[in-house]
Each structure stands twice: as structure tokens, then as C-alpha cells.
């Protein structure tokens, strides 16, 4: 799985969304780089799957919206019916979710916040802007690392 390859951990799935965390056993710089690399590779792999399968058999394409943020969180294990489940809570999680929601608004498949860029080893410049996030008082600087959505988005 791509998340494991990039040292991420799947935390939760809900409908067509998933939540992952990076940096549990690495530096903040490695976590930022790994999360960006994972996001870019997910987009590339989905393009390949669209070309080889979904377009061929269903005449459809699927796209993703990925939001990445960095910040302090609470991480723990919860036990439900004898099964341990990792959980991550905090404002940073909420901001990441809002950033993911904003991918449609800004028409870009991968958005990362300024905090992630600052911690990463990325040197090249990317399109950036300010965005107001629902439920968050301050605007956030975001960087668009993905691509525009196709018009026939499924």
C-alpha cells in the first residue's frame, strides 16, 4: 500500500474518504516529505488505474482530493469490542479535513498548507494563495501541488 511505502499509517476510512497520519516514527521534515510524496503517487497511480481499467470497462474516470496539514495532535489507541483502533484528534486534523474539502473550491487535487511546505525539503515554487476554512478563524496559506480536475469529474 502506498501509505506504508511512504511511512504513513491509515487511521480511518469513512465512505470514500480516508485519514492517514505521517511522522509517528520520523522527523517532521521526513513526515512532510513522505506525506507529499504519498499524495503525488496516489494521484499518479489513480491516473494509471483510470487509463487501464475504469476508462476501458466503465468509460469513467475517478479523481481524488488530498489535503495535507501539519500540527500538534493527540494520538491514542481506543478499544472497541476487543479491537484496538488508532485515533488522532486535534485542530490540525480538522484543518487537514477542511483543506481536503477545499480541493474542489480551488480546483486542485493536492493542497498542502504553508506549515507543511515550511517543514518539507521542497525547494521549487508552487502556486499559492490564502483560503478561509469553515470553522477556522484565521485564513491559511495553501500551496497547490496537484493538478486541475477534469471537467467530466465522476
Language-model-detected regions and their locations in the chain:
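Cytosolic regulatory/linker segments at or just downstream of nucleotide-handling modules
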Residues: 73, 104-154
Amino acid at each position: 500500500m502506498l501509505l506504508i511505502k511512504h511511512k504513513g499509517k491509515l487511521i480511518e476510512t469513512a465512505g470514500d474518504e480516508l485519514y492517514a497520519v505521517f511522522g509517528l516514527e520520523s522527523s517532521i521534515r521526513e513526515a512532510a516529505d513522505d506525506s507529499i510524496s504519498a499524495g503525488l503517487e496516489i494521484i499518479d497511480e489513480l491516473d494509471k488505474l483510470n487509463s487501464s481499467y475504469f476508462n476501458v470497462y466503465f468509460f469513467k474516470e475517478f479523481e481524488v482530493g488530498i489535503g495535507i496539514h501539519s500540527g500538534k495532535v493527540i494520538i491514542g489507541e481506543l478499544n472497541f469490542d476487543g479491537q484496538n483502533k488508532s485515533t488522532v484528534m486535534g485542530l490540525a486534523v480538522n484543518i487537514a479535513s477542511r483543506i481536503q474539502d477545499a480541493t474542489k473550491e480551488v480546483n486542485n487535487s493536492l493542497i498542502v498548507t504553508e506549515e507543511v511546505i515550511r517543514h518539507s525539503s521542497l525547494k521549487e515554487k508552487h502556486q499559492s494563495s490564502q483560503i478561509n476554512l469553515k470553522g477556522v478563524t484565521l485564513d491559511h496559506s495553501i500551496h497547490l501541488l496537484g493538478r486541475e480536475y477534469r471537467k467530466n469529474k465522476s
